[in-house]
Amino acid sequence: MVRPRSGIVLVLCAPSGTGKTTLTRRLLEEFPRFAFSVSYTTRQPRAGEEHGREYNFVDEETFIRLRDEGFFAEWAEVHGNFYGTPLEDTRQLLARGRDVLFDIDVQGAAQLRGSLKQGCYVFILPPSGAELERRLRARGTDPEDTIRRRLANARRELQQAHWFNAWIVNDNLEQAYDELRAAYLAATLSPTCRPELVDELLQDWR
């Protein structure tokens, strides 16, 4: 009898305005096997948030101690607050066969690549710089300096896209989702998800 596969890490990175949130939401709706490990943060809880549900809220001293002990699979400082994903919690989810989705920046993805091996790294690309700028302006929510900063960040992120497993251009939402879905399903067939499969089949060969 073939044992179920272990879980995989699916890491999605994209510049702001590329449509990653919409694609992520659709993937989670279709595949309930995905799970999230609860991250740690030093920021203050917002209204309605609970410790252990949205985040594990800790002070900066505790976070830095955990970071230095190698507790996090990845961590980052964002707007003066620290955020980190617990490594052991993620490993336990994977061992139970749950797939873990990360929606993080390129720096966090690079850290994950070093700490978690069975990962699929997908970069969502805009059709062009001009189209990305059009989308950001169409939101009507960001001031000019924020738009310029997001465009500059997008350029820097694109310069690091070469090491990802898959590139998906979100020019058409349906096509982009089909490609993301295909990349995810292909990753679940990797031998790293069932490293013992062939040896077990050979042992039971008749």
Swiss-Prot record:
Residues 7-185 form the Guanylate kinase-like domain. It is found in: Cytoplasm. Gene3D superfamilies: Guanylate Kinase phosphate binding domain, P-loop containing nucleotide triphosphate hydrolases. Disulfide bonds: none annotated. GO terms for molecular function: ATP binding; guanylate kinase activity. ATP binds at residues 14-21. One of its GO terms (cellular component) is cytosol. Keywords: ATP-binding, Cytoplasm, Kinase, Nucleotide-binding, Transferase. InterPro entries: GK/Ca_channel_bsu, Guanylate_kin-like_dom, Guanylate_kinase, Guanylate_kinase_CS, P-loop_NTPase. Its EC number is 2.7.4.8. Pfam families: Guanylate_kin. It is an enzyme of class 2 (transferase). It catalyses: GMP + ATP = GDP + ADP. Belongs to the guanylate kinase family. PANTHER family: GUANYLATE KINASE, GUANYLATE KINASE-RELATED. Essential for recycling GMP and indirectly, cGMP. This is Guanylate kinase. It comes from Oleidesulfovibrio alaskensis (strain ATCC BAA-1058 / DSM 17464 / G20). The gene is gmk.
